[in-house]
Amino acid sequence: MEVFYNSKFVTNNVFLNPSETQSKPEVKYSFENNKLYTLLMHDPDSVYGNRFHWIVTNIINDVKNGEDVLLYTGPAPPPKTGTHRYIFELYEQIKHNDVKIEERNISMNFVKKILNIREPISKFRFISRNESGGRRTKRSRTKGKRTNRNRSKRVGNRPTIQKRY
């Protein structure tokens, strides 16, 4: 499978900024004549669980000939959620599908079941993160450890907390 954003070839597992991926990509594959295919694009790292960005079914010979079950939406990872994987998966269909999907945050197993698809015949992925930071917030290394700042003083058998003003 080959993926092109803005007419540029994209290498598998490459990092792309969300701004580079807002337009619908062109997907190419060596399709067998008169067979039906389904293309899924999803983000398994979404804050709300698996999120679908694009679903195309009933593809014959070219993705452009397929039916958009779920229209394309470009990646938009929220700030401080780290790196997200965006995965394209191509499946061979058993029969013609007349399914409409409106929800984007749904499980992969549910989608596979309603589309009657099994295992992908081709996969592609890229990674992305929010352009305004993108790193998860670092946790304090001293969390739970006793340091000079949070050490308590013992009076008898009971600790009393040293207050900072």
Question: What does each model-identified segment do?
Answer:
Residues 1-141, 147:
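N-terminus-centered regions that define maturation/targeting leaders and the start
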